[in-house]
A protein has these predicted regions:
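Metal-ion/cofactor- or nucleotide/acyl-coenzyme-handling active-site neighborhoods
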Residues: 1-171
Length: 171
């Protein structure tokens, strides 16, 4: 479904998932929700929040967008302590099993969510998580406002999250 697919068997490593917490990149839009047992924590595209104390010991999946292959992906992988360019295996990150998924930069659901004609990494990750887990998805740090990045169509993305899933806590 997304470029270098992970195997479905890797996702079976995450058992007893009762909800998914997807972390975006807006620290001012914070629910301060502490991950509880059964929460699968997913950080997408940006690695800054992997060092925020609230999540320091609990990032299970880092989803990267393939379009940033040289400019962003390698430094991001290095920053969170994962081996450079090895994107389909599991690693130990702060005593947690961390799988890194390399996502293709085009969405196969025909949703053109960014002004550049590409789906955002967040929405790709959202669809991917929905495909494998039938649990509520909480978005942390996604405001739905458009000031942060001019290439994102934030209102379209905001609407799509609600249209395609059981989403709560978008501030």
């Amino acid at each position: 479904m997304f470029g270098k697919n992970i195997s479905e068997s890797m996702l079976t490593l995450f058992t007893n998932v009762s909800q998914i917490l997807m972390i975006a990149n807006n620290p001012n839009c914070s629910s301060m929700m502490r991950p509880t047992p059964g929460t699968l924590v997913v950080r997408f595209n940006h690695c800054e929040n992997t060092s925020v104390p609230l999540y320091r010991n609990k990032v299970d999946i880092l989803a990267l967008n393939g379009q940033y292959h040289d400019l962003y992906e390698n430094p991001c992988v290095q920053k969170v302590g994962l081996p450079k360019l090895v994107l389909t295996s599991s690693y130990n990150f702060n005593n947690h099993n961390t799988s890194t998924y390399h996502l293709d930069s085009k969405c196969h659901q025909m949703l053109k969510l960014s002004k550049a004609g590409l789906c955002t990494t967040g929405f790709q990750t959202f669809l991917y998580m929905r495909r494998f887990f039938a649990v509520p998805i909480i978005l942390h740090g996604f405001s739905g406002r458009g000031a942060e990045h001019p290439r994102h169509a934030y209102q379209q993305e905001y609407s799509a999250y609600h249209r395609f899933g059981n989403v709560s806590n978008i501030c």
